[in-house]
Amino acid sequence: MKLYSDEELAELLDQPIFHMISDVADHLDVECYVVGGYVRDIFLERPSDDIDVVVVGSGIAVAEELKRRLGRKAHLSVFRNFGTAQVKVASSQRTGQAGPLEVEFVGARRESYSHDSRKPIVEDGTLEDDQNRRDFTINAMAICLNHDRFGELVDPFNGLADLEDGIIATPLEPGVTFSDDPLRMLRCIRFATQLNFQIEDVTFEALQRMADRIKIISAERVGVEMNKIMMARHPSIGFEYLQRSGLLQILLPELSALDIVEKKNGRAHKNNFYHTLEVLENVVKNDAPLYLRWAALLHDIGKTKTKRWDPAIGWTFHNHNYLGAKMVPAIFRRLALPLDAKMKYVQKLVDMHMRPIVIADEEVTDSAVRRLLNDAGEDIDDLMTLCEADITSKNEVRKKMFLENFRMVREKLTDLKEKDYVRLLQPVIDGNEIMEMFHLSPCREVGILKQTLKDAVLDNRVPNEREPLMKLLMEKAQEMGLS
C-alpha cells in the first residue's frame, strides 16, 4: 500500500479520460467524483479497468455528453430505471489507457430498504448520502474530478486508515448495512479474503447476528461471491470466516458439518473441516483452476454420513467418496453453479479421490495404473494433484512414503500416456459388434461381455488384438449360454 497527497492523486489521475469527465462536469455545472474500488485500488497499487463515477446531479447526462465527445470510439448504455449509464471505450487512443475501459456513471443518491428485499428505495442525494450507502469504509472514498478540486480525496469514514490497518468495517452501524443488503455479508468476507484483511470486531459480531438474512439473496449472487472467495490467493481465510459467522451452516451445511472431532476409547478422528481447508490451500499452491478448487472443497463432504466406529480399527469413513459425489449436484443447484460438464468433473474427482491413495498404499502395479488412467481419462493430472494435496498427515514418514509412491504412479502414468494407452486400452471389439454377432439389443449381457474384454485388456491378460479378444469373447458367451 502507498499513501498519496491530493497533489499526487491529481498526477495519478492525469489521464485524458479523467480530464474529459472533468470538462464535462464543469460544462454541465455538476460535481463529479471517482469512487469505490478504483480509488481503493489506487492506494493498494492494483490495476483497475472499471471506473465508478458519482455525479451530484444526473449521471446519465454526464455519460451522454462524454459519449458525444468521445465519438465512435465509445459505446453508451443507459439504464434509466436505475438512473445509471455506462461508457465503454474499446480503444486507448482517446483515453490514454492501456486497454478496454468501462466508466459507470450514477447520480448521488440515498437508499432505504424493506426487511424482506434487497431492492432499495432510491432518492436523489448528496455525495455524503452516497458515501453513507457504500458497503465498507475502504470503498467509500471519493476523489473529486472537477477542475478546481481535481485530485482532492473525500474520506469521511477514515477508509484510508482502515486500508492502512488492514481492516474491513462499514460506514454506518453494521447491523443496518447488512440488514439493508445481506449480500454485503458475503462481500465483507470476500474482501477480507482477497486482501488478507481482518474484519473489525463490531462488524463481525453484526455479521454473525444477521447471518440468517442471507436467505433472501438469490442463489446466483451467492454463487458469484463464493466463486470469488474460492479464487482468492488463500481461500481458506474466507471459508473459516464463513464457518465462524454461521453463514456456512446456511450455504454449505455439508462442509460446515465436518467441523467436529469425536473421540471414543481414546481414539479421535481429525477435524475434517480444517483438513479440507488444508487440502484446498494445497491445490491452490499449484494454481488450481476454479472447479479443481471446488473438488478439493467438497472431496470429504460424504464423511459425516459415513462415519462409523469400529472397535478394532477406530473411526472409519467407508465409501465417503462415493456418497460425496452423489451430494455434489444438490450443492451446485443450491449455489446456482453450472450443472454441466463442470459439475460432472467435480463429481468425478470427488468420487475418484481415494483411488490413487489406495494404489500408493500398496504395490504400484501396471494393471492398477492402467485402470486408473482408463477411468480418469483426461482428468488424470487434476486427480493426481487433488490426491497429493490430500496428504496432510503430520506423520512425516508416512507422508514421505505416500508422496514417493505418488511419484511412481505419475511416472507410470507418463509412460502410459506417451504410448497413447488411453486409446489402446479400448478393446478393438466394441458393443455394436457384440450385439450384431449375438443378435442382441442393448442389454445387461452386452455390458458383461464388454466388461470382460475391457478387464482382460486393462489387466494385460490378453493383448488388445482381434484374434485373442474374439477367442475370449466366444468363451464368455458360451459360458453365458449365448452361443
Tell where the protein language model's regions lie, with residue ranges.
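Catalytic cores of the polymerase beta-like nucleotidyltransferase superfamily
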Residues: 1-483
